[in-house]
Every structure is written in C-alpha cells, then in structure tokens.
Amino acid sequence: DKFWNEFYVTRIYYAFLISMQTDTYGDIPLSYYIKGMLPPTQYISYTSQKDVYDAMFKLLDEAITNIKPDKGLNWGEGKGSNDRCYGGDINKWLRFANTLRLRLALRISNVDPDRAQEEGKKAIESTYGLMQSNADNMRTVPKVAPIDKGGEGGGGSENIHALIFGWGAQMVMSKDLEKAYKNESEVLDPRCEILWWRPSPFSDLKEAKESNKDFAGCPIGNMDVQGEDATKSYSPVRCNKLISSDHNNLDDNYWFSEARELVWMSYAESRFMLAEAALRNWTTGSVEQYYIDGIRASMDYYNIDEAKKQAYIDGLKNKQDVSGSDKEKALKEIITQKWISIFPNGNEGWAEFRRTDYPELLNIEENNSDGDVPEGKFIKRIKYPQSESFNPNRPMGDNQGRK
C-alpha cells in the first residue's frame, strides 16, 4: 500500500512507452512484458496493434481510477525528486494520463470512431482534466543538466546538442519544415529563428556566428547531406558549442544546449487535440480558440515576444478555414500547426502525418526502399529487425509501405 500510487504511475509510463513502440512497428510482442516476463530469444509471438491499443486504454483507465492524489508519491518532490518527468507531482501525472488517452483516442479515430469517441470523452471529462499549462509538459531532462534543473549534474548529453556537435553537423532543417515556417502566416514563424541557424560555415557556427542567408531546408531523400559542408546550404539546429561546458546556461538565443529538456507531450499538443476533438463533436468549445491556444502555448514555451506572437497569429493565411464549415480544411490547419509545434519530437510528427496525411509534404527526392514504399508515397512503419525474418510468428506482409 505504501507504493500504491507509484505502481499506477509506472503503468501510465508503460502505456506511454508502448504507444511509441506500436506506432513505430505495428504489431509488437506485448504479452510477455504485460506478464512481467522476458520474451524468448527466438520465435516470439506478436500482439495485434488493435489488442495493444486495448491494453493501453486499460492501463490508463486503471491508473486514473485507482490513483489516490491525497497520498502523493514517495519519490521526493521538487527539483531533487527521483521523478525525472514531473518532480513527484501526482496531479501532473494524472493530467498527463488523460492527455495521453486523448492522443491515443484520436489515433484510432479513422479505424474505430466509436471507441475513439468513447475514450476521448473519458479523457476530456475526467475529474483530473488535461494538461493546464506548459508546466505540465511531459519531458525528460538530460543527466548532464544540473540538479536544480532536474538533471544529475553530470553524465551523458543524450540530446540534439550532442548530435549537431558530436556527430558531424548533419542535423538540418527539412524542406517541409521550411515551407511551414514561411507559408503558414504572412510573417516568418518566430519559432524558426529560435530553433535554427541560417546556412553558414560550420566553423562560424562554432563561434555563434551566422550568415545573412535565408533559412533553407533539405528535401526528403536528399543523400548529399554529408558532414560539416551541409551547414553551408541548409539551416542546422540552433545551438552554441561555446556554452556546452556551462550546463547551467539555458540561453534562448541558442536553444539546444546540453542541459535542454526533451518534450514528449506538450500543453500545446493538448490544445490542438481539443481543437480536433471539438471538430469531431466530442466536446464543446470553439475549434478556432483551441487552435489559437495551441499556437500561443507553443510560442510561450519558447518565450517568444508577445508582439511577434500576435503578428504571426494575425497573419495566419488559412485561419478562417478552422472556423468554417469544411471540416477537412479545418483538420488540415489544426494538424499542420500541431506538426510544427511537435518539433523536435519526430516520432510523434510522423505518427500524426500517417494518421491524417497532413501536413501536405513535398514528394520524396529519392526512394531507397527496395519497393517497400510505392513511388510518391511515404514510409508507414519501421521494419522489424532482420533477426525476425525467420520467425514464423512474424506478421506477414508488414513492409514499410503498409499501415
């Protein structure tokens, strides 16, 4: 009974981890882990994605029903807590559980609309509610970050900063993201200037210097992004090697430092989900207001000036589509802004694109799928490991071009 709440919080986290795995691969060997077993080394059995979703909804429902908020958590509270996500705040875990439930409900809205609405309404109408602010963002902090920022004061730097300065400078903007930053509003999306450098020599970027070139993205499938030369043509992620040794420095001018947290689910996403839920008549409220709230929440996270936020919102080219009678046009705008806000969580952006076909991405420049993915189409899932090719229980016909 002492660890009652801890048990159910781990179930919430487990459902979150399962969701990422099944959305990446489809059917997965879930039954072993649900039973607390290690799977055999060969010939494992797979659980269908439908049954995996059933299991996730069950885990979340049991956790939300059984957690006792007045008991708190025994992981310590605040910045020194062993809880790397929410600092021992049980109410934030409950709001995350509901928000995750809504995400999963929307994920199945095209294949099982009745179940999706049932689960979505439970999430929205729960006593504990959804995320309330950016303080509720589900995130993890790198070990290298100081203790007062949620880290351990040392250890690995497992984040985007390490990728840009440790792994060859190949983290550059996509052409699709460039298009979204430039074309959604009459003004450049202010998040672009926070997250990306202008194309510049890598040696200059090490000194936090950039050119006056326009921001530029790389087309999907371009195989010429090799090493440090890539930053001369395309915009790399905005970080500064000069502050990498100062783990206390979280400078908004160089967003991706070694101490920067990684956000897995945000308050902004929850507002965009409410916009879609209202569009589907799962809840009341203004679709357009939820949509605007999502944009504002995303920009608030990056501490963007109010005047820049308002100029961007005032300049939105298709805002009228969100409040219009054409639900497909409204969905397109909601998901496009959601996709922008989700960066750099690529897995979630990919999952939303596969679900909705939004945003409208540019054609792939080079298809290297060996026929798995039809020309002009996009990858739908990741292949199972090669070691599974001899497993008679492996789902048949599941290639990268199949949902």
Residue ranges and their predicted role:
Residues 296-403:
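C-terminal functional modules
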Residues 1-301, 324-329:
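Structured, solvent-exposed acidic/aromatic patches
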